[in-house]
Design a protein with these regions (language model features):
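Conserved lysine of the Walker
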Residues: 37
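Short hydrophobic/aromatic beta-strand immediately N-terminal to the Walker A/P-loop
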Residues: 26-28
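Short beta-strand-centered segment that lines the nucleotide-binding/catalytic pocket of NTP-utilizing
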Residues: 50-65
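Short phosphate-coordinating micro-motif centered on Lys-Gly-acidic
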Residues: 1-3, 46, 84-86, 92-138
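Phosphate-binding P-loop
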Residues: 18-24
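P-loop (Walker A) phosphate-binding loop of NTP-binding proteins
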Residues: 30-32
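N-terminal pre-Walker A segment at the start of P-loop NTPase domains
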Residues: 1-17
Length: 138
C-alpha cells in the first residue's frame, strides 16, 4: 500500500493495512519522531476493539493489549542500545510468541527482526498529511 492520508482518513488506512498485514505477526513502524507511529497504532488498536488505554511504551518498552484475536504487544525500541539489552528485557520472547507485535523504532535493534516482517513507513508531507508505504519483507 502506498498513499497520502490525513488524520480524518486514518481509520480507512489502518483497515487497509490490517487487511494487508494481519497474517504477519511482526509489524515494524519506521518514521521520524512526531510523524504518527503511536497515533497509527492507537487507531489500529481501536479498530481491533482494544479497550485498554493505548500509549507509547517508551519507558516500559512493551505494553500488552488484548483484542478478540489474542494479544498485541506494542513495543518501543527507542531506548534500546543493543541486541543484548533487548534480550535481557525479554523482547525476543514476545517476538517468538506468535502474537502480533507492533514495533516503534525497529531500526535500533534490527538483528531481532527475523522472518517475514510487515514494514510500515510513515513520513510527514505537511502539518495535516502523512504518507504511508507498507510491504511484507521476508
Amino acid at each position: 500500500m502506498e498513499q497520502n492520508f490525513t488524520l480524518d482518513q486514518i481509520q480507512e488506512v489502518v483497515t487497509a493495512a490490517w487487511a494487508e498485514g494481519k497474517d504477519i505477526p511482526i509489524w515494524a513502524f519506521y518514521a521520524a519522531m512526531g510523524t504518527g507511529k503511536t497515533t497509527f497504532i492507537h487507531a489500529l488498536c481501536t479498530m481491533l476493539g482494544v479497550e485498554d488505554a493505548v500509549s507509547s511504551p517508551t519507558f516500559a518498552l512493551v505494553n500488552e493489549y488484548q483484542y478478540e484475536g489474542g494479544s498485541l504487544f506494542h513495543m518501543d525500541w527507542y531506548r534500546l542500545g543493543s541486541l543484548e539489552e533487548a534480550i535481557r528485557a525479554g523482547i525476543d520472547e514476545h517476538l517468538h510468541s506468535g502474537d502480533t507485535c507492533l514495533i516503534e523504532w525497529p531500526e535500533n535493534v534490527p538483528d531481532l527482526l527475523a522472518g517475514p516482517v510487515f514494514e510500515i513507513r510513515l513520513s510527514r508531507i505537511d502539518e495535516k498529511t502523512r504518507h504511508i508505504y507498507s510491504r511484507v519483507k521476508s
